[in-house]
Amino acid sequence: MTNLRKTHPLMKIINNSFIDLPAPSNISAWWNFGSLLGICLVIQILTGLFLAMHYTSDTLTAFSSVAHICRDVKFGWLIRNLHANGASFFFMCIYIHIGRGFYYGSYLNKETWNIGVVLLLTLMATAFVGYVLPWGQMSFWGATVITNLLSAIPYIGTTLAEWIWGGFAVDKATLTRFFAFHFILPFIITALVIVHLLFLHETGSNNPSGVNPDSDKIPFHPYYTIKDALGLLFLLLTLLMLALFSPDSLGDPDNFSPANPLNTPPHIKPEWYFLFAYAILRSIPNKLGGVLALLASILILLIIPLLHTANQRSMMFRPVSQTLFWILAANLITLTWIGGQPVEQPFIIIGQLASILYFMLILVLMPMAGLFENYMLKPKW
């Protein structure tokens, strides 16, 4: 008798995706972050669902409804802390996941990569509208500053901003629609994840060497299920440690004050995971130029497959590209630091230099390094 998991229409899909899936035998722990992102998504949807049961999307009661969740709802404090810090872990995992794809040349699976970039943009939109919901000072002013960037678009900008606000400023209508967006977007993300996996399983996983692994494959279960379970254990442990012992360390103290349109906080800044893009936005004195640079800093990921010049797929055996990759990583950390600093010297010039270096590394230096490495590998006799 044939096994049910191989014949049943639904079980067959699960079997071919998570059990009998042929996987390269040499994929490292850097490949764990895909499954961790899936776990993060499940955690966020579940905790978010329970928060939505008690939250009210009205400017008069939003802030106090969040306080009510933390004080009066059974384990409400834990659900909220897991949701708020879960977002940080989601971004930590996605940035490492993108970095791994960049380092090992996974972007040459173009469909999977492009869907991944769309996923990143959707996740950023979800996190942004979610940050507005508690209706604290930083929520309100963050929403005001970021949505105001739309007014930089020539001719239609102001109309577009007012259309998104549902009025002449960020107010009740904005909060209500942001809650609606924040509720629906995770389900759109889930659909995109399925498409992402569909395209991934068309080509199969890449591996650290970048060489075609078809000659040496092993079944996903039990080898990678147990490996993913270990990663999951680490993720849950660190998330619980953060949510239980230091839940507010990644947040902004200003968000403990209710939103006040008449009082601007001294330093308006987004959550830490947007600071690198915020630093790039601020490094250009012109409003429209800043918005374009902000968009370019994310959308540049779409053209990375076109900038691949090396004969080898992975950076594993390409020391020059490796060096540039880690300079890029350090540069992004620098931008994240600058994004959280006030707009004054020397932070302005550091931010401008780091922004120029970010685009230079991706658009010029890394493609040149690939060509140089090709030349170095050519026999010279």
Swiss-Prot record:
It is found in: Mitochondrion inner membrane. Heme b b562 binds at residues 83, 182. The chain crosses the membrane at residues 33-53, 77-98, 113-133, 178-198, 226-246, 288-308, 320-340, 347-367. Heme b b566 binds at residues 97, 196. GO terms for biological process: mitochondrial electron transport, ubiquinol to cytochrome c. Its cofactor is heme b. InterPro entries: Cyt_b/b6_C, Cyt_b/b6_C_sf, Cyt_b/b6_N, Cytb/b6-like_sf, Cytochrome_b, Cytochrome_b_C_euk/bac, Cytochrome_b_N_euk/bac, Di-haem_cyt_TM. Binds 2 heme b groups non-covalently. CDD domains: cytochrome_b_C, Cytochrome_b_N. PANTHER family: CYTOCHROME B (PTHR19271:SF16). Belongs to the cytochrome b family. Component of the ubiquinol-cytochrome c reductase complex (complex III or cytochrome b-c1 complex) that is part of the mitochondrial respiratory chain. The b-c1 complex mediates electron transfer from ubiquinol to cytochrome c. Contributes to the generation of a proton gradient across the mitochondrial membrane that is then used for ATP synthesis. This is Cytochrome b. It comes from Planigale ingrami (Long-tailed planigale).
